[in-house]
Amino acid sequence: MGAGASAEEKHSRELEKKLKEDAEKDARTVKLLLLGAGESGKSTIVKQMKIIHQDGYSLEECLEFIAIIYGNTLQSILAIVRAMTTLNIQYGDSARQDDARKLMHMADTIEEGTMPKEMSDIIQRLWKDSGIQACFERASEYQLNDSAGYYLSDLERLVTPGYVPTEQDVLRSRVKTTGIIETQFSFKDLNFRMFDVGGQRSERKKWIHCFEGVTCIIFIAALSAYDMVLVEDDEVNRMHESLHLFNSICNHRYFATTSIVLFLNKKDVFFEKIKKAHLSICFPDYDGPNTYEDAGNYIKVQFLELNMRRDVKEIYSHMTCATDTQNVKFVFDAVTDIIIKENLKDCGLF
């Protein structure tokens, strides 16, 4: 009888210990939801977490990006070539017109993700053309990957035999996120589960079941989107869409107690763009100086003023460049400190 009771006690103690361990583990688990409109930079942040908090990209993994990088490069030059027609821009050298036709034909016949020498030669000739450059300058008038200039101006390196993509090449690559991608890593004694959710409108209905028990939402908005329209609706300004989405998330009943951090991303692209295109394109009421600081601050205020519970809920914001590892490292460190302060003070661990 006594032996049975002590075995029961032992079992009970073990169970109690396990429950305590589980509770501690749960308290140390941070669920992070990355939200934002399409092409705002969510997946680039995920890649940075792999570089900063995991072991980065192995040689094999880097090599897997070659096909994506070649595909991105080809799609970018094709988008510019098509825009030459729609924007009625003339080639600087009429011989490039034949190159463009040849490229269109080749694009339909080559194996996807490859870059034959004849094709890379044509692309390099086209990229040097003054008409193509003029068209590239007007990229906000059609859909063009942010990485277009990065890859096209460095194509010679990308097609060198034995080419291995660098971390920056990998970070710049673009694949549309469909569904939900989870990344796990540890940092500052916490276990992070980060969920990247497709941003295009068709993807948004998949978000809902991710909402439960989320510790923190990182909402990503592209600063540089102020003069651009959506891929899925060319009547809607991308910045307006982003504000609309942020409004619905930061005031959602699901997130009453969730920490929200705003990443105003692509600050590098915005820095260059604001010199040429006035912010009033997006915000007709804006009459302040068209500088990086003033215009950037105005955009930040537009987002933060949507928070209906400003008196009790603070939304933290950061200007970010998702392709800059040091910048992301610094900002994520600050975000983690916010999470520790806001969400873990109640559990007695910190």
Swiss-Prot record:
Subunit structure: Heterotrimeric G proteins are composed of 3 subunits alpha, beta and gamma. The alpha chain contains the guanine nucleotide binding site. Interacts with RHO. Interacts with RGS9 and PDE6G. Interacts (when myristoylated) with UNC119; interaction is required for localization in sensory neurons.
Biased amino acid composition, Basic and acidic residues: 7-21
Function: Functions as a signal transducer for the rod photoreceptor RHO. Required for normal RHO-mediated light perception by the retina. Guanine nucleotide-binding proteins (G proteins) function as transducers downstream of G protein-coupled receptors (GPCRs), such as the photoreceptor RHO. The alpha chain contains the guanine nucleotide binding site and alternates between an active, GTP-bound state and an inactive, GDP-bound state. Activated RHO promotes GDP release and GTP binding. Signaling is mediated via downstream effector proteins, such as cGMP-phosphodiesterase.
Provenance organism: Homo sapiens (Human)
Modification type Phosphotyrosine: residues: Y142
Chain spans, region Interaction with RHO: 340-350
Modification ADP-ribosylcysteine, positions: C347
CDD domains in UniProt: G-alpha
Residues the record lists as binding Mg(2+): S43, T177
Residue span(s) of domain G-alpha: 28-350
GO BP annotations, alphabetical order: adenylate cyclase-modulating G protein-coupled receptor signaling pathway; background adaptation; cell population proliferation; cellular response to electrical stimulus; detection of chemical stimulus involved in sensory perception of bitter taste; detection of light stimulus involved in visual perception; dopamine secretion; eye photoreceptor cell development
Entry comment describing in which tissues the protein is expressed: Rod photoreceptor cells. Predominantly expressed in the retina followed by the ciliary body, iris and retinal pigment epithelium.
Family in the record: Belongs to the G-alpha family. G(i/o/t/z) subfamily.
Gene that encodes it: GNAT1
Lineage summary: Eukaryota, Metazoa, Chordata, Craniata, Vertebrata
GO cellular component: apical plasma membrane; cytoplasm; cytosol; heterotrimeric G-protein complex; membrane; neuronal cell body; photoreceptor connecting cilium; photoreceptor disc membrane
Location (main, coarse): other
Illness the protein is tied to: Night blindness, congenital stationary, autosomal dominant 3: A non-progressive retinal disorder characterized by impaired night vision, often associated with nystagmus and myopia. Night blindness, congenital stationary, 1G: An autosomal recessive form of congenital stationary night blindness, a non-progressive retinal disorder characterized by impaired night vision or in dim light, with good vision only on bright days.
Name this polypeptide is given: Guanine nucleotide-binding protein G(t) subunit alpha-1
Region Disordered, annotated ranges: 1-21
Keywords, in A-Z order: ADP-ribosylation, Cell projection, Congenital stationary night blindness, Disease variant, GTP-binding, Lipoprotein, Magnesium, Membrane, Metal-binding, Myristate, Nucleotide-binding, Phosphoprotein, Sensory transduction, Transducer, Vision
Annotated segments matching region G3 motif: 192-201
Pfam families cross-referenced by the UniProt entry: G-alpha
Lipid-attached positions, N-myristoyl glycine: G2
